[in-house]
Structure formats: C-alpha cells, structure tokens
C-alpha cells in the first residue's frame, strides 16, 4: 500500500479484511457539483442560469411591435474575498451582467421586418458564490443550503388503504405532479364513479375533462370498453363469442352450438369449458332475448326514416328498445362488455352522473370550479383550460417528470415535452381503471425512485426564475408604453426583484441554515444533510410514520442511523458514505459487478429503480482467491428483501461494509455491536464535540478519519507536490516540483493559515503547521492541522484511561467521575471566542459618540481603554468591565434644584449625555484577542481606527513583499540556471547584483530567448505585486458601507478558556453520555499494580440495558493499543537498535488477517524514527464498521502488549490502598466534551422582567428568567399541606403585582410580613371567561 508523506508519519493498523475497491468519494461533491451546474455556462440550456434566462426570454411586448432577446451572461469578479466578507459582514458574491438585445419591428412593413436592433450589457444583481468548502457567506456569516428530498414530478397511483370510507372499501386515485403548475387528481368514490380534481379543488366527474378535450360519449366509451356484438335473427339473438370473457361467470342459459351443449344452465364456466369452445372454433352462440336486457349500448342508434334516436350511447337496452331497433331495420347491435371481476362499468357509470353534453359546457363547468363566482364566457373558459396543462409558461413536468411519467404509463415518445397532452390524460385514466380492475400495482411513495433530491443549484435556479418572471411583467408593460426609439435595454430592466428573490432565498429560506461549525465533522454532515421539510416539502405535523421510517431503498443511499431525535426524526437524513445524485436527482449507490460468478472490480452506480431488478450480495460475503463466492448459498437482496440465494444468481455485490451508513456513523468503531438507538445518539453527539486545545487522534478509529479531516476543508492541503521551503505559524511556502509546473510561472505555492478566528458556534478555528522545512510533500498531503485534527486525521476528543466500576455513588445514573489530572493536563480545555459589537448611531437628539470620556465612571473602570475609548488587545476582562466607551445624547428632562445648581457651577456638559457603553456580559471573563473598527464613509476615523489601518497596511505589505521575494527568488534561481548553462561562472554571478542578471546577454539564441522570457515574467511579477498592493491598500483605507444611520461599529473579540468542570456534558462515541459529577484528586482515584491511576470512572450499569457493547470492545482494544505504545517507549528507554524496532513494528502490523500490508522495510531510517516517535502514545488502530477487529485479534494484540487477555486489571482504592475485590475492565476510550457547558447554562435570577399579560416572571437564561413552579410542584406542596409556602409561591413570588410591591416595601421597613392579593393570571382567566360571553363577577363576603 502506498502511503502519502503525512500518512507515513503515523500509520494506522487496519483490522479490515475486505479489499477496498472504491475510495470514499469527495464528501462535499453534492454541494459543489450542484452549484457549479447552476453557475457554469451550459450551451444546451438545460441547467442553471442559462436555462432560467432561456425559459423567460425572449419577452415580447403586448402589441408585438418589439421584443427583448437574451444573448449571453457573464459573472464578474467578487469585490472582497471570503475572509474579508466575513470580517465586514457582507455577502460573498459576483455581479451578474447580461447581454440583452432589443429588437424593434416595423409596424407598417410586413410582419417580422426589423426596424432597429440595440444590444447592451445590463447589470442584474449579485449572485452569492459558494466557497471552496460548499458554504455561502451571507451578510458575513457562513450558511449552508441543505438539499431537499421531495416527491419527484410524474404520475403516482395510490390508494387510501380503506381509511376514507366507513365500509373499509379501498379507493384508488392517480395524481399527476408537475415540476411547476397545477396538480391533476383522478379518484374513485365509494360508488365507483371516477372523479377529477384540479389543484385539490372540488371534484367533477372525470368524463368532464375528456369532454373538454373534445370527446363525445361514443368516443369516451370507445376508449375505455371492449364491445360485444349481437346479431338480430328473427326471434333469436346471435352473440359474438370471445371464450376468455366467459371465464368465472355462471351460465344463465345453456351454452350450446352446433347441437352440442358445452355448459349447462347454472354451472360455472371453467378453463376446461373455454378450451373446448376454442378447440371447436365456436365464434357465435345463440342467446335468449332476455339476456340483452340491461346491457349498455356503445353508440347512438337512430331511426333513419324519422331521424329520432332509439337508443343513446351509454343507455341500457330494454325489450321495447330492442323491438324498435328491429323495426327500424338495425340488424346488429353493439354493447359494452362489463363484468364484476375485471371489467368494471366505471366510465359508463361516470358518464351518467356527468351533466355536461358537449365541449363548451364541460369547459364552463371547469371554469366555474376554478373561478367560482365569475361569469364564464366561452373565450375565458377555453383560455383557462388551455393554460392549466397545455401552456409551457404555466405548466412544466420537467425532464425528470416526463421520464417518470412515460415509464409509468409505458409511453415511448414525447421525451422532451413538458406539458400534458390528450394521450397522457387518457392513459392515466386507463391505468387507474386497470388498477381498480385488479390489474397492476399502486406506487409506493416512500420509495427512493419516487423521491428526488433538490440541491442548491436547482433551488437557486428556481428562485432566480421567480425573480425573472417578476421582471418579465414589468418589461412587457414598459415595452408597450414608452417611446421605443429612445429606450435602451438598461431602461427596461430593474434588477431589484431578481436581487430580492435571490437574497430572500439565501438569507431566509427554511433550507438556508446557519452552518453548524462546532467541529469539522459537524460541517461535513451539515452539508451532506437531506431534509424532507422546507418549501414544497412536508411539514412536521403532517408527516406520518411511513415517511419517517427506514425504507428498503435507503440501503446505501440514506443513512438508517443518523437522524435527529425529536419531532424531526426521519424527516432529516444524512447521505450515506458512497451515495451520489444522478442527473435526474435520484440517489445512486455503487455496486461491484459480478460476471459469471466472479466478483470484478468494475463499479456501477444504480438508482433505487434500477436496483430492483438485480440480486445483490452483501459486502461481507466470503470470497475465494479467484474472486468467486466461497459459499453455495449467500445472503443477498432482491427487490429489497434479504434472503439466501444460490451464488450463481448474484449479479452485483456491495462495494464496502460502510456503504449503508453515513460518515458520522462510520466513525463509530464496533458499530456492529451497538444497538441502533444508541448508535444514533453516538453519531449525533460526535457533531457536538468541542475542539480541544490539543487535538488527540483516536487510538481506536475506523480508518475514515483522514477523509473527513481533509474533505472538510479545515486543514491546509497541498494543491501540488513539492518541497517545503519555509514554515511559520501563519504561512507555509512550498516549492513546486518541476513536473507539476505550469510553463512560465514562478513555481511557488503559498498557504496562509487561519489563526484564532471565531466559528459560528463560538468555538475557535486555528491552523497549526504539521510539516518541517525541507520535507517533500505530494498533492493532497496535509500541511497544517485545523481544529479537531491531528496529523491530518479527525480528532474530536481525547483518549482517556477508563475503569468500569461504581465509585461511591459519584457515577450513579450516568454521572462521570473525572480525575484532577485531566484538568491539570488541559486534556479537555477548550477555547471559545465571543464577538461583542458596539454600534454608534445617529439619533434624533444627535449622534452617539465612542469616547473614553464617560460621565460618572471612575478611573479604574476606564483603565483598560485607550484614548479612543476602545479596549486594548491583550486586556484581561471580567463581567461588567467596559469594552467600548459610548455616550448617547439624552433628551431634556425636568431638572431638580440640585441638578440646576450643579449645572450652574460646572457648566452645560454635566448631564446631557448618558453612558451606553458596551460592557462584558456578567457570566463571561476572558482575554481580548482582536478589535475591529468600521467607520462610515465620510466620517472621520478615530485614532484607534487609523492605528488598526496602519497595522493592516503594514501586515499586507509584509505579506505581499514576502510573497514577492519568495516568487522572485524562485524566478532568479531559474535565471541563474539559464546563465550557468550559457557559460557564466558561478563565482561571477555571485558577485553580480541579482537584479542585474536579467540584463546580461548570452551567445546561444535559445537560451537568450529563455532569459528574455524570464525578464518579462519578472516585470509581470513586479507589476502584479504593485497592483495587488494597491487593491489591498484601497480596500483597507476606504470607508465601510454600513447600514443607514450607523456611524461606527466596533467589534471586540473575547477569548475564553474553559476547563472541564462538574456539570459539563461528556460522551463516548457509542451514545454513552453523562454529566461530570465530581473532579476527584489524583491520589483518590483507583490505580493498577504499576501505580497508574485511571482518568475517568464510568458506571458499568450504563452498558447492559443500553446494549452498546461496542464501547467495551473499544476499551479493550484501546488498552492493547496503548500497551503497544508503552512497549515501544520501553524499547526507546532501553535504546535498542533500529532493526529491533523494525522487527517489532512489522510483527504488530502483520497481526490478524487484514487487507493492509505494511512493509516497514520499505521505509527509510528517518521515516521509521518519525513513526516510532508518533507511536509512543499508542498504536492507532482502524476497525472499520461491520468489518471490525474480531475477538481473537484483540486478544492477540493484548498478548503482544503483555497485558491480560481478559482486558481486566487488578485495581486498588486510592484512598485506602486496598485492592478491589474483583478485577476491573480498564482501557482507553475516546471521550468527547460536548458543547453543553455548565458555564453557558448556569443562571440565577433576582428581581427581573415579567410577562406583560400574566405578570409572571419570564423563563430562560436569555430573558434572565425564573424557575417555573409548575402544576406538579403545586401538587407536591398540597400533598405536604404546606399552605403558606404554596400561597406565597402562587401570589407574591409570582404574579400578584400589588403584593410584590408591598412586600418589597415591608422588607425595606423591616416588617417581615406579607399580604397576598389577587394573582394577575386569575384576572386573565376572568377576562377569558367574559370573552366567551359568560358574565362572571367576584363578590365579597359580607
């Protein structure tokens, strides 16, 4: 196996046995690909902005004299880069410029003669841009657009499963769902009539829609029924016989022909009878005249002599009608063939309840239903019906919808047609009737073949189209009004509606969410989230159990484990590890192809629909050397059902064991031993882990930690291979390999690192280099670790030494006992960064001022401010300290005589301003790490702002100069090489000034040309540097674009260091969560025979009932991993030679049956030394989900580390030194500190705010609220008989307003008594009763 440079530094021992056929695809591709499709210029006009423009343009004026045509669009360059946008609080976007052509036709000349053409580029607003990591910066905050799982457009056949009608009869319905436009529903009622609804309005008989399409009753019957022909012969009737139609009927007369009786009267017609009739070739039989009575005529029969109708189409035939027919000379008669079994008379019955007679009356009926109360005219009715389903502006099935529609009704043509046609409607009705007749199946709407993914690009395109349509209306009106000769395209287009639509979508759509930025995993998971909620989706209240449940088609597409607990369960899902979207938006998952019983490495992506046709073997099926299946019978899936199949039947095989689950779930080692409910909690809690101060890779992982860390974008990854030229805390410089160079560039890559910035969740984002100068790196190598990453691997928590045992009740009910050593070593210390903002506005009374001159504030309070009134960087502040001094003018008030005196003595200034400074919130203390001042254009900058500006300019200049020097150095080195080739000596060059090298000349023409090219490049480089610096300078010095009325904004960043303490929530990766109950001194913790104390004591009772046994296996394997590290440490202490280390490492990596082949011999001595250094803390292990380390391997590893195979050690009580009576399970578990910190939750209330209506105290920390004394607490006091306590709880301590004030007075006066009055909420109750019209009054007892 080939390891990259960073991977060699610490090789994970992999226990997986299945070969890796397919690497996990790039995790953010669902976001990036979708948005690229939206922005990229698509020549076909199928997707993105191009499609939106083409669907709206050309816009014609109402009078047809002119039209506005779309030519092309281009996106400009963003003004600020991503970081600047975040700092300034603006949106990261590109301007959209569209080239439009206004064509004016000549009124007087023949139609289509062009009079004038004007082209112009028009600005159409800003399009937010996706960053490289799949997020958007909107108003300075990072947001993610979550993909939506919605019902695919197309036609769906469904039934109510007998729930609608009391009889329990199953009613079938069909629904045509377009991508945009009106819904069309067909449904049966309990009397078996077929109805149609448009847009879920009131129902009409379904024949109305056929009539509206111009069909007569005869044609309608012709479409839906088979016919039976009767010939009238004297007194008998000859019936045309189709033997198959008789099957299952009871003969009501003897069936005989040619003198032979086939079926006697009263007998049932069987398959044997039918065979005999077919064999004898009987095609007509005689039937009694009574047989035809009650049959239904299929067409109109007319007496040609008189012209009157004898029998109407769809009319039942009576004996009288029969007589009239023979009299009129009709020799044959055609009736509808119906029976109760599989040819129901549904359409015939429906026509009877249909009151309309022709096309116009049908159209009018539809118009009345859609626009009740409006007088229908023929034209209006026709126009409405036409626009419902047949106009491209109003109705679009979309490519997906047409594809689904055609495959459902079995139509081959009309691939591109977005609207419906007559055939579509007829076919849907036919299929629905066939289903009612018992042929065919209803669809399963939870099948992933009927639900598709709508990603960012598609939703943005839809919003953009909405904006364009709004513009279209305005353009049409303007084209019709104005003087066209003077108008340019610019004057027609108002970009506001477009900007507004796009802004609304990115800023406030339900699916545009504030990015969960706790740690890299939460970012990745958020971007891979699939929600069924949102516009055009479900609502929590309406979603039933079926939609939320795991469906068989989720296999390998959506994770069956990771979903929120609570009201959204099952509605928000996560994409499985290998899943991807196909061009239609359906989810696909990869499978290995099986050819002639041999599993190949060819991979096919199958959607849920395609998968149904195949037999698919599981990923853990045993294979032979040749790649065939080892067992005769294998577990496989077919049509979603798992079962045993002969191995010859398998057509595909899963690609990996973690194919089924999401990224978060595949990070849980030994997932296969955990109960699903706990695994769900484990997957969800990893996303809440706070990045610790020192990241620590998990000893027991699953092998995909590197994928998550690299794909999340929090690490710095090498874009091209090369050698590290220099490294410092804020930048890494790589000299690129020759073969990866683009001709004519300097060949230097510079990576600027992010230092101590704030994330959305107030955690700290900081990158640390993990490479040294001179190290070779290749493309994709990790150069710097971000938050929660360690040597390029995801590291959410810390490896803790754990014992499972009770300890004096301190770990009762999931509490956690932690050793003081954990706090001392800062294992779970986290940095949180808060942003506090102070805004100076223009008020009616004058403008607010940021100043250090604040009235009535002592010197000590101002000690941390500079002369501008802004706190200096590095100050340690605590709750209540002033960060930014600000004064606000206050209105003139009535002055007291004392104040007047003060004014007279001290002049005017004493009290016309009030102190509105920004102070540190009460519960916070920390260090100021950054201050930013934004000043409105045209307002003079204060001293601090200018200082910051100078500093930024200096930094920018330093950065760019360094960058320039590095690039220049690279270029001059190449110049030097050319000059030496041309015959100059090294010594001469070293004495010449390097800048002068470019002026030297060479004999050789080729080399001279090269030298001249390099000189040109140097000039370009210099010009580029000047231009870049100028741009940077302009950005830094220009005023800021602030909201109206805002003069100045000061942002102060405060870093808080939080150590772990009782009340903080911690968890493992298996859903085993708990709260710290006590921090115990190290000397009191249990310790083993070597004197090593444990870090954490967990309660063993937390394991059996929760069935998450994975944690026990993790602890055992962690112990072995740490044991190997200890053994390496021992060897280092003994200073053994390198060969011994190589031998031991080879032994470790070869242990167990694994797919991983690590060849220690192929590593250089330096690489082995680095590896040893990194393994001293323990051997990192990968145990992939569903393919983890078996028990035997764990025991073998424990044995190799000289530890007991049981994984249990003798422990001693730290307080007494006595041995505990049984061995205890001790080992290493990866523990996370979750973002539920006691510091953020702790809260106490004194007198505070009250609710307006009930006058009760508010609740919650944010409102400085109280604790609710609820009904159960009231019952408790009632049960104790504590009447007076109860009285004060319900009155003076809650909502008795007068009582409250009196009590305060009494306490001040030293009189400790209370007089409870009427609680305000009782008055509210009285008012509510009165509002119901019941007069209720309180009467005093006399």
From Swiss-Prot:
Keyword tRNA processing: no
Molecular function terms from GO: DNA binding; DNA-directed RNA polymerase activity; ribonucleoside binding
Keyword Kinase belongs to the record: no
Protein name per its UniProtKB record: DNA-directed RNA polymerase subunit beta
Alphabetic keyword roster: DNA-directed RNA polymerase, Nucleotidyltransferase, Transcription, Transferase
Protein task: DNA-dependent RNA polymerase catalyzes the transcription of DNA into RNA using the four ribonucleoside triphosphates as substrates.
Any one of the GO BP annotations: DNA-templated transcription
Species this chain originates from: Vibrio campbellii (strain ATCC BAA-1116)
Oligomer and partners: The RNAP catalytic core consists of 2 alpha, 1 beta, 1 beta' and 1 omega subunit. When a sigma factor is associated with the core the holoenzyme is formed, which can initiate transcription.
Family membership: Belongs to the RNA polymerase beta chain family.
Taxonomic superkingdom: Bacteria
E.C. no: 2.7.7.6
Cross-referenced InterPro entries: DNA-dir_RNA_pol_bsu_ext_1_sf, DNA-dir_RNA_pol_bsu_external_1, DNA-dir_RNA_pol_su2, DNA-dir_RNAP_su2_dom, DNA-dir_RNAP_su2_hyb_sf, RNA_pol_bsu_bac, RNA_pol_bsu_CS, RNA_pol_bsu_protrusion
